[in-house]
Amino acid sequence: MKNNDKLDSHTPMMQQYLRLKAQHPEILLFYRMGDFYELFYSDAKRASQLLDISLTKRGASAGEPIPMAGVPYHSIENYLAKLVQLGESAAICEQIGDPATSKGPVERKVVRIVTPGTISDEALLQERQDNLLAAIWQDAKGFGYATLDISSGRFRVAEPADLETMAAELQRTNPAELLYPENFEPMSLIEHRHGLRRRPLWEFELDTAKQQLNLQFGTRDLIGFGVEQAHLALRAAGCLLQYVKDTQRTSLPHIRGLTMERQQDGIIMDAATRRNLELTQNLSGGSENTLAAILDCSVTPMGSRMLKRWLHMPIRDIRVLTDRQQAIGGLQDIAAELQTPLRQVGDLERILARLALRTARPRDLARMRHAFQQLPEIHRLLQPIDVPHVQNLLSQVGQFDELQDLLERAIVETPPVLVRDGGVIASGYNAELDEWRALADGATDYLDRLEIREREKLGLDTLKVGFNGVHGYYIQVSRGQSHLVPIHYVRRQTLKNAERYIIPELKEYEDKVLTSKGKALAIEKGLYEEIFDLLLPHLPELQLSANALAELDVLANLAERAETLNYSCPTLSDKPGIKIMGGRHPVVEQVLKEPFISNPLTLSPQRRMLIITGPNMGGKSTYMRQTALIVLLAHLGSYVPADQATIGPIDRIFTRVGAADDLASGRSTFMVEMTETANILHNATEQSLVLMDEIGRGTSTYDGLSLAWACAENLASRIKAMTLFATHYFELTTLPEKMEGVVNVHLDALEHGETIAFMHSVQEGAASKSYGLAVAALAGVPRDVIKRARQKLKELESLSNNAAASTIDGSQMTLLNEEIPPAVEALEALEALDPDSLSPRQALEWIYRLKNMV
């Protein structure tokens, strides 16, 4: 049955459902019926699969059974959370009419639309992770990109110039939901993502976007936000804002401005670099053993989210970084003490967003009150700290004595979950509410008196007075004594072992009590809305306070981490270069069972590239990554895992470290490696930090060596980037003799018989030999295989003595036309052969072919 069949053939209720469904054809419609939300037709089938709920049928409409699935109203949030995680959206349709006065179906309407990117309910959100809605636009000039965190009001735009930059932005922001125009061309960029929403082109119209944004911010133009000429970004922002208004169906007073994010303000990292450095997600997709896992001991969820934003967008403004460093230094002695009241502040940022959307629940207001109660202690602790940035943040934190007093007077100590449960507003706040409550609360005494009186008067020891939601108040008598009740007892309900009655006096009291309860609840709801009206004018200061408290949490956390993990304050210099004494890998040193071996590093204009050799497992990758992480931490304003560090200007960090086949895109390991390498060679500058690990290993020996040599040469002589170049090609250790600014270093190892000990210490000069066979033995490769490998190694070394590999003149190498010595070519062909698969004739042909080669 299709939802758009002629409405006349359906029952009135299904007609109502189909009209509402027609307004929301793309998303699941949860249709309130009594104590359940029901889904019908294709929605029911889809929901039963997505949510693992039973698919049933409900009667018939238009002569056919109606597929139906449903969930209880009290557990709707759990099901919505599951849908949101799957990238799905849902429209929630409530009964707004009174069943008692309705003719035909009760009036219903969609009161909210839940989508992955627009949720603000704490039950649906991940506490320590941003939840972003994003929109993307693209034309010949580049990309426009907008993100909004509705749970904080943080609205950002950017204009990535090319596909690689756009891919990095998508990975950095990782939106829960992404709006894109119907004519979007590079679908490969986004098609693997959850929560994609295709939008019509007119929603990205520029003039409409400017109009919408000015209306939202109460401005005449967007010049004050610095985005007036950012036309690509504004198109995306306009579509995004319209979508939020459509789904939220309320004003959005907490979205008060727009910030342009410019690449040059931060250290640029492409998608591969973010992945390889394992900032917030490890290579397996989890969060264990990441930089965030070590660094994030924030005590508020909003602080944790801010720290992760800092990790993904390190900044270059030395003034801001110095402010943060000084604040961390100033907070070190009181960090633990400060974290006690901060922990009690909770997630004020998201509570304020729900207040702005008028969806804050009673417990949100109780938490807000509790947060206000912590502010005097925070002021007491921070006032003596003589650091300008700390005092600036403290002034933004403010004090909200009047609002605290309001919430202390208005909201009970431990409120219920929902306003409709009643009992939210404290006694003494409103005289009229107290009167109606007294009437309702007096029921218990009256009912006790009535029960005793009737039991004694009639001599019925089984008589008792009770109440249920369906039949209201009743007098219950056991079946055995029911023949003794007087005539004015009117039967209301028959049970298996008892009869329930009503009498005029009880009916009159029931009407009075139910009226008083209903009246009290109506007054309470009105007062609750009034409290919103009293709080909302203070929203800008409250948001500023929440942001300052989050930053204080991050800084106190970084102060505690610096003290606990023995980090030092780096020096940020305007002179090019990186000098690290006793550098350590922040994650590896925490995971290792034995002590971590710290290492120095020096890069300067005269020492731009380190060629790093040494055994596999010797620590080359760790040494390279720790350098990048120390540089990144310094540009958070954090202390760093080193005895001492001086960091010059850095504009980008690139990593070409390890690779796996990208099967989904049909790209081999080598193709992935070369794509990442091309990106580095096109975009690195003199101020970039480049990590190149084992470049060229995904192809044949000579192809790989040629590529590695040419890349190293290009980075050192043309780009002049600060480069750490790890390689297993010993031929590259001759580069320092041919080029300025290139230096050999190696990681030490000691070999004894067939065993090897990795020293993990970095020494000047090239490694003296390779330790591949020793590492293979350590990995458990059978002894006879190792023995055979040693024999083979000797043969190959004797064969290669005259080969060009050992005497390559790098200045004469070209990338594609290097001649491979015949003996080596024959050896490679022989190694590729499978003798068991050859027929006698083929084997004979191969013997002649190999003879011709040599």
Swiss-Prot record:
Keyword Aminoacyl-tRNA synthetase listed: no
Cellular component, GO annotation: cytosol
Matches recorded under Gene3D superfamilies: 1.10.1420.10, 6.10.140.430, DNA repair protein MutS, domain I (3.40.1170.10), MutS, connector domain (3.30.420.110), P-loop containing nucleotide triphosphate hydrolases (3.40.50.300)
Binding site for ATP: 614-621
Domain of life, per lineage: Bacteria
InterPro entries tied to this protein: DNA_mismatch_repair_MutS, DNA_mismatch_repair_MutS-lik_N, DNA_mismatch_repair_MutS/MSH, DNA_mismatch_repair_MutS_C, DNA_mismatch_repair_MutS_clamp, DNA_mismatch_repair_MutS_core, DNA_mismatch_repair_MutS_N, DNA_mismatch_repair_MutS_sf
GO biological process, any: mismatch repair
Classification via CDD domains: ABC_MutS1
GO MF annotation: an example: ATP binding
Coiled coil: none
Entry keyword set: ATP-binding, DNA damage, DNA repair, DNA-binding, Nucleotide-binding
Pfam families (UniProt xref): MutS_I, MutS_II, MutS_III, MutS_IV, MutS_V
Function description: This protein is involved in the repair of mismatches in DNA. It is possible that it carries out the mismatch recognition step. This protein has a weak ATPase activity.
UniProt record similarity statement: Belongs to the DNA mismatch repair MutS family.
Protein name: DNA mismatch repair protein MutS
Species per Swiss-Prot/TrEMBL record: Yersinia pestis bv. Antiqua (strain Antiqua)
Upper lineage: Bacteria, Pseudomonadati, Pseudomonadota, Gammaproteobacteria, Enterobacterales
Underlying gene: mutS
